C-alpha cells in the first residue's frame, strides 16, 4: 500500500530536484540565456501541436495556464471550477518538465461549501520525440503527486500519486495524442478506490491558427463507492494557436486560447455536460 509519507516525499523530491538544479545553474553566468537556449533546443525536437483541451500533452511544455470549467449535474445544479488544477510548467533540464499546479477554487451554487481544492506537482520525462521533419511523434512519462490541502471537502481525503504514459503521432495536419494513467490514493483506499484515466485527442490544423479537435475522456473506477463503473465523455473543442507576441522568431512568447464541451456518453456520470475554457501563455 502506498503511504501518505511516500506521497509527500514524492512532492518534496520533485521540488528539491528542480530547485537544486536552478540554484546550481544560477551560480553560473548567463543563467537565463542558458535556460532559454536549452528550452528552445529541447522543444524544437518535438512536434509543435497545441496542448489539447483536456488530454495532457505528449510533449514537454513551458507555459502558464489557467482553465475555467462549468459542470452541469443531473440535478441541474452547476459547479464552477476556477483554475482546474493548472499552473506553471517549466523545462529546467533537457527532456524534463516540472509543473506547479495551483489549487482550484470550487463554486458549487448549492448547499455544498465553496472552497479551494488540492495542491499538486508533476514531473515529466520525454522518452522519445521527433519534430514534423523527423517522424512527427512524442512519447513521455509523468508522475504527479497531490496533497490533500482542499477546504470544505473540495479535495481528496488523502494524498495521491498518479503515474501516466503519454504518446502522440502526427500525420500531416492531423495529430492524435493519448494518455493512460492511474490515480492511486495514499490511504483510505477502500473508501476512495483506485481510478484509471484514459484520454485521447485528435486535432486537425486548419489555416494558420485554427485547431478543431475531438476528445474522448474515460474514467474507470476500481474499488470505492463507484467500484466497477465507467464514466465517459466526448469532448468537441477548438484551440486557437498560437498568437506570437514578439516578432523575434527566437522568442517563444505566445498566447493560446480554446474551449469545448464535455458531453456524457455513459449511463453513470457525475455531470451531464462540462464547459471548458482555457488560456495559455507560452514562454
Question: Where are the regions a protein language model picked out?
Answer:
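Transmembrane beta-barrel domains of Gram-negative outer membranes and organellar outer membranes
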Residues: 24-283
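Cleavable N-terminal export/targeting peptides
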Residues: 1-35
